[in-house]
């Protein structure tokens, strides 16, 4: 009977919370690489459209970057794949390049887009500081900033940036062109926009390292 009890005993894969988190992170990394490998194969066989492939590929590459930071002891993707016997040459190649195969290395365009977003932030903040309060003057400037932020997946946009800009974009779009914002609203708008701008700059700096 005791022998049967030993056979039925639960096998523990970890001894504490830290080991459990490591196991979950390893599983997540394995799943992301496996999914990326399958995505590459599906695209090569025309099972997904170019747009679907591009969107999903960027998403998986971002998930890989986040998960890889959480895994302790994994020095490279090649080492991880070898250690856990994961055959994923296409996924490894995609991660090395850092972009879908359909996207060319347009670093120059990315830098131009970043410069455009920075310019839109500064222009909008300057308008507020110069006491511009009319909706028909503020909204076009904020709309340019909002569209610039949402027009690319190649530029790192923190959720905090999108949320704060969208908040005021929605607010102004619901007002009449002849309306004006109050000084209190302008003050809060400056505070939120500066916070969004700082988050944007922080995300850019983190991407460089």
From Swiss-Prot:
Record text on subunit structure and interactions: Component of the ESCRT-I complex (endosomal sorting complex required for transport I).
Taxonomic lineage from the root: Eukaryota, Metazoa, Ecdysozoa, Nematoda, Chromadorea
Gene source species: Caenorhabditis briggsae
The name this protein goes by in its record: Vacuolar protein sorting-associated protein 28 homolog
Assigned protein family: Belongs to the VPS28 family.
UniProt-listed GO biological process terms: protein transport to vacuole involved in ubiquitin-dependent protein catabolic process via the multivesicular body sorting pathway; receptor catabolic process
Keyword entries, A-Z: Endosome, Protein transport, Transport
GO cellular component term of the entry, any: ESCRT I complex
PROSITE patterns referenced in this protein's UniProt entry, alphabetically: VPS28_C (PS51310), VPS28_N (PS51313)
Main location: other
Keyword Hydrolase: no
Pfam families, alphabetized: VPS28 (PF03997)
VPS28 C-terminal domain sequence ranges: 109-205
Record domain VPS28 N-terminal: where: 1-105
Coiled-coil regions listed in the entry: none
Compartments where located: Endosome
Role, per record: Component of the ESCRT-I complex, a regulator of vesicular trafficking process.
One term of GO molecular function: protein-containing complex binding
